[in-house]
């Protein structure tokens, strides 16, 4: 909730962003009371199950279908969210996302993407260590996805792709 409070202050309490919060409702409410954020900026979705940092993706898929991570990703399949932020288990996040969000037919592996701020604007960095083994097709797919993301974010710029691991 403190992060939402900082975001709202930084953006002059603009109502063009709404937060769907997934997790233990009691814990979220305690934080909400500390930060005094208007409910017009968020909605709480209670999830009683937690994915631990030690949990394997396979175990999480079997046991965590009511977890905050599962529910947050699933909210994107139902078009209730466009963005999911997680500070949790990245391996589980990647597998749950791949399972629920799927990929387009021509893409065999998804890639994690990060926006990397620099002195002039932002860079797009893909994969971020999520895929240990990549073949030529995966690298082409990552290049196309990265270029498409960059063009969507910065339509006036030319997307220049650098391949690090060949």
Regions found by a protein language model. Name each.
Residues 1-55, 77, 83, 87-166:
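Anion-binding alpha/beta catalytic cores of soluble intermediary-metabolism enzymes, centered on
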Residues 56-63:
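Short, surface-exposed amphipathic charged segments that create phosphate/polyanion-binding patches used
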Residues 65-80:
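Short, well-structured alpha-helical segments in soluble
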